[in-house]
Amino acid sequence: MRVLGIETSCDETAAAIVERDDMGEGRILSNLVLSQIAEHEPYGGVVPEIAARAHVEALDRLVDRALNDAGLKLYEVDAVAATAGPGLIGGLIVGLMTAKALAMAAQKPFYAVNHLEGHALTARLTDGLPFPYLLLLVSGGHTQMVLVRGIGDYERLGTTIDDALGEAFDKTAKLLGLPYPGGPAVERMALQGDQKRFALPRPLKGEARLNFSFSGLKTAVRQTATELVPLTDQDVTDICASFQAAVADTLSDRVGRSLERFKTEFPDCATPSLVVAGGVAANKTLRAALENLCTRHGFAFIAPPLNLCTDNAAMIAWAGAERAATQAPDSLDIAPRSRWPLDEKSAPVFGTGRRGAKA
């Protein structure tokens, strides 16, 4: 089965063609992503209206290129899949309506994909990973630990109770006068800094619950920087290094408890695995900390290639293909959802929930 996938949930316009054979193995035939960093950089973050307009301008051409790169015509794909949520509603509408129109024109089945499910299933495309496994999703809009039991069968073990980790990186970078996007900028500066100079907090470390919290850490960074004004270059690098070390310690503690939970629930699992996805997964320091953690706990550490960790359409096409193998297509009446948890039957997280551009 060959599926055309479309992703427009935030600030990347993406189109891809993925093939899934009868044995469940996948192959990427094309995968194109057009970033909007240049459009949003002057504002220090994603502007929803600008993002939606950029999707409108780019998507049709990108779909044509994806088909051409795969050597296919639209009528030769077997299904069309698009992100229907969660994300920025304007961008979701652009991608969803385009995908519906293509599916209708080509008389192909349509699948509305949860963006988070795309991340959750990527390791099955890249590594052929069997169920069950753990997923750590760390991005600008989400920080979640998810137990992946099967297609459509997910349990959220922990999530952020305030800020997503990617947002904490971006806000720290903006506070220190570093360029957008903030994650890579903080990582570069941290390489030159002293991570022991500032004693920043490790939120929720040692607690039994599996949730995350980064608001207090972000506030501590602001207070530290304010006390040092005017900041020297060394101050900035040391703050970045101390911040990154605090994040690594926090993740190791939170994820370590989730690994123990997994082993308790699946004691006979022959290949326990931790999958890490999302833009923050590109951070080498955090990856190294998580790899060491997995080694100590006897888990395989799996991080898809960087271009498949960040937002892309190959994961959406693959999620559509996985669902098509066992489920009926979705109605063309389905609406986009700015909020769409993977585990809809679970109790809501305490508080008002995530807010902001990538919530």
From Swiss-Prot:
Cofactor note: Binds 1 Fe(2+) ion per subunit.
Binding site for substrate: L137, V138, S139, G140, G141, D170, G183, N283
Coiled-coil positions: none
GO CC annotation terms, alphabetical: cytoplasm
Top-level taxon of the source organism: Bacteria
Residue positions binding Fe cation: H115, H119, D311
Reactions mediated catalytically: L-threonylcarbamoyladenylate + adenosine(37) in tRNA = N(6)-L-threonylcarbamoyladenosine(37) in tRNA + AMP + H(+)
Name the record gives this protein: tRNA N6-adenosine threonylcarbamoyltransferase
UniProt organism field: Brucella suis (strain ATCC 23445 / NCTC 10510)
Gene encoding the protein: tsaD
